Structures are given as C-alpha cells and as structure tokens.
C-alpha cells in the first residue's frame, strides 16, 4: 500500500522512488551505558546502517536519526527483529534497552533508561573513539510495544529533546502513562490492534490518544490486529494472548506489513524532515481498507486533506513573501503555517481572493501551509530561502 500511496500522490513519486531505493546493511553492537546519577547500568543492543552486515562493522557515512525502542513485558528485545530489519536499511539507528526484563519491572526506571540512552547517543556522536562518531543526527524518536509503549509516554512527558513518539499496543503503566499524556505535545503516532485482548484499545490506547496535547496525533487501528503480532514470535506473549483470543483472523506478517506502510512515511516526515511524506502518510490513511484511524492536528480534526489546484501559492520557493490565491467560495477560512515539526507559527483569516503573506522574519527551511474551512482542510508546502 505504501507504493500504491506513492503512485496516487503523483507529485511526490520521485521522493518515493528515492525512499524505497535506500538499502543499507544492518550492523549491530552492544553497549552498556552507565547512568551515574542513578548508579545504573543500561545494557543496550544497537542496530545501525552499515555497508556490511555483522557485529561492530563501521557505520555507513551519514547522519542517522535515533530510535529508542522499549520491549513489552517479559518479551526479549530479539522479538523485535522485524523492526530493525525494516528500518535500519532505510537509514535509522535502533537502540533496544534490555533492562526491566523481570516479573516485576519498574516502569519509571525503564522510561528513564529511554531518556538516558537518547541523550547518550548524542554524546556518542561527539566521541571520536565511538563507532557512532559523526554519524548521528539530532532527531530522536521514542518507540515501544505494550509495556514499552506505555513507558514511552512516561519518557516523552515534558521532554523537549524528542521529535516524535510512536507506540504499538501501548499498555497502561505505573506511574500512569495515561496521566502523562496531558504533558506530551510532540507529534505522536499510536498503533492499535482492533482485536487486541491483552491491552484493548478502549481501555488503553483510546484513552491515551484522547489525553494527548500533541500538535499532531494519529491513532491507527489495524482491523483484526492482535497484541503480539506487532513483534515476532514470543512464547510468553503468544500464550497470554491465546488465553483471551486464540483465533486472530490476521497473519503476523500481514499486521507487520500494514504497520510498516504507515510507520515508514511517518518516520521519514518526523525524523528526516521530508515534508512530502506527511502527504503520503495521509493519502495512505484515506486509501487503506485495512485500518480505521483518528487524527487531530493543530487543534483541528482532519476530515479531508489534499493538495488542490484551485488554491495557489506563488512564488515557491519564497524569499520574503508569497501570494495566496483562493476562489471566492473558499473565503473566510484560516491559513495556518507550521514548521517542520508541526508547531504553529502563523495564523490568519483569509477574506480576499488574493492575499500577500509576509515571511521576511521566517528562518529559511521548509514549512507546511494548511488552509482550513469548516470540516475541510487543504495542505501544501513551501520552501523559504534567504533573501539575496
């Protein structure tokens, strides 16, 4: 479906070709980080882009975003091989803390491990004796499954150093992940299994989604999806799920394929700052018959989101200002400009068919233009350049 979405979004076909063409090999290493403030060792398995497959191979040239991934209750990190095999070749570094694997995990300690690894990886980037020297970008995501998804909310709470939060069948934690949502404002993507009986969406992810104060949040429910199928086979997880739903009507590889169809463009947008991927992501939401979804971005529920020819922006790229042209029947809506991480930086009601928008005080870079009227919104993008 991802390829289909790329073809449907014909304006972005060249982007999709590049994205799908990346093909790094998977290197891996093990690092024990030491948090001196907590007197705590944090054993971490790390998978990264390399020109060669294997342990401790050199990292490929580039600056790669970091993803911290939290495991589920009693689920070994190795059960998430499907994630590193899908994402490392696309140019991401995945870090799996192997802490809190016992029968009585401390969820707050686990969340604090996420935060420490995220900051430590940035230090590794500056350490000329590290395998990761000069290979890490400043952009970081928190991801997790089940208990690890819940811990991700705890780690993201009031955390200005994380670019996006993503979780899969997230479960409530102690302290409460649900309570933490009200202090989370970063763009967030929640995956749920429609037939998950271990952490049913109605008792877990639905409440988390509703509580978020994110600038942009999306919840995707995979029709017939289960709890354990986000990961590879794990005996304890499968046993627990079989006790309440022994006959899922979806295959594991199908659920993982659906997940990747949405996860990859979201990461490309939120961590690699490819703004066209946000359009691909939303095209896929609307085109897919295998999911249901809720989305709320910038304070407005998105009922319909598309690029349309009748709304024109010129010139683009922009030096100091652009003209916004709109048909008469679309007047009296609001134009909103967001930066690349989804923060609103401009808002204006449009009352004329041709309006000049001044960007002279904007930094150079990419921006999203939303035009919203009633229950519809249109999206486009601009590039701001320095004035000669």
Predicted regions mapped to residue ranges:
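N-terminal cap/lid segment of alpha/beta-hydrolase-fold proteins
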Residues: 22-62
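Active-site-adjacent alpha-helix of alpha/beta-hydrolase-fold enzymes
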Residues: 183-257
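Short glycine-enriched nucleophile-adjacent loop
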Residues: 149-159
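Active-site glycine-rich loops that stabilize anionic/oxyanionic intermediates
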Residues: 64, 71-75
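Gly/Ser-rich "nucleophile elbow"/oxyanion-hole loop immediately N-terminal to the catalytic nucleophile
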Residues: 56-63, 108-147
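C-terminal outer-membrane/trafficking sorting elements
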Residues: 305-388
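Alpha/beta-hydrolase-fold serine-hydrolase catalytic core, especially in secreted/extracellular enzymes
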Residues: 224-226, 233-303
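Short amphipathic alpha-helix adjacent to the substrate-entry channel of hydrolases
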Residues: 78-97
